[in-house]
Amino acid sequence: MSTTPMDLVFYGCANMPTTDGVVAGGAVTFSTLVTFADMATAGTVDYVSSSASDTAATLTVTGLDSTGTSQVETKTLTGTTIVAGAQSFARLMSVVAGGTTAVGDIAAISATAVVSGTAQTGSANSTGTTPALFHLASGQGASVTEGQVIHTTGGTGPNQLARIIAITGYGTDIVAVDQNWTTVPDATTTYTVNGGALLRKLPNQITTVRRPFYDISADVPGGSARTYYEKVFAVNNNTATALTSASIIKQVDPAGGGTLEFALTTALDDTGTVANRQTAPASGITAFSTGAAPQTIAVPSPGNLPNGTAPNAAGAQGIWFSFVLPAGTAPDATSFTMRVSGQTV
C-alpha cells in the first residue's frame, strides 16, 4: 500500500498563541489542522454537517472583515441542513468546534461557491496506490484550488464533505480528496466547491482549523522589523508504508511584504518550545531556509516519515516557520504552500 497525498497531513502544536508574550511550540496536537482555503471574495459563511445527528455541535469562526476588523461568529449546526451565517468575512483565521462532539464531518464554508455542478463518472475511493478522487464537471478543474471543500448536495451520495488535496496528476477535471467517500459519487451527484474549513471525524476528531501566524502585525512605519515563529508538524498517516527519503518543501511564498523561511526539528516528535512567538528556537533544529520558493530541506536522519496507526504519533516531523514583517507592512490577504515529498512503494 503506497503512501498517497491522503496520508500526509499538517497538524498544529500544543501552543499556537494569538498574542505575544506567551509560550509557543511544543508537541504535536492531532486535533488541530493548519490547512484550509480562504474566502475567494468577502462574504458570509455557511455551517453544515455530513450527519443529520449533529444538532448540538457548534462552529465558531474568527476572521477579519473587509475593513480588517476582527469578527467572531458562532452557529449551532442543524445536521445536514445548511445554517446561514450573517457576518461577512474577508479572511478566515480559525474555525473551532464546540458544543456536543460532532457525529459527522463538519464544515464552515463560503456561502458563495467557487463552482457548482453535477459530477462526471470517475470518482473513486483510494486504491492503496492512488488517493480518493472526485470528477468535477467539465472545465471546472482549472477553477479550484487545494484546500477547498467539496460538499455533495444531491443525487448519489449527498451530504458528504471532503477537502481537495491535489488538483493535478489524476486526469482532466479530477481532483484528489482527503478521505474516502461513504458513497462514491457518480454522474448524478450534485455538489458545490467552497472556500472554508473542514473538521473531519476520522481518523480522529479535528476540533480546530487555523491559520499560521494568526493575528501578527508589523511595527509602525519607521520602526523595526518583527520576526515571528510558529511550529507545525508533517505526519504520514499511512498505516503500512513509510515515506522514505522524505523532504519538506516551501513550494509557494506568501505575497506581500513579509518573508517566510522554515527549519526542521532534528528529531521526530519534538516537544521544544520558545518563550514567545518572537523568540527563535535556539537548538534542535536545522538551519532555516533562505531565499525564494521553492526551498527544500531533507528530513533529518533517518530521513523517513514512518508509518503508524493514524493519527501517527510514531513520527511527527516538526517544522518551525519564521516570518519577517518589515516595519509599516500593510495587512495582506495572502497564503503560502508547503509540501511533503519522498519515495514510496
Language-model features: locations:
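Surface-exposed interaction patch
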Residues: 222-287
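Short, solvent-exposed loop/turn segments enriched in Ser/Thr/Gly
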Residues: 26-27, 224-231, 315-319, 330-337
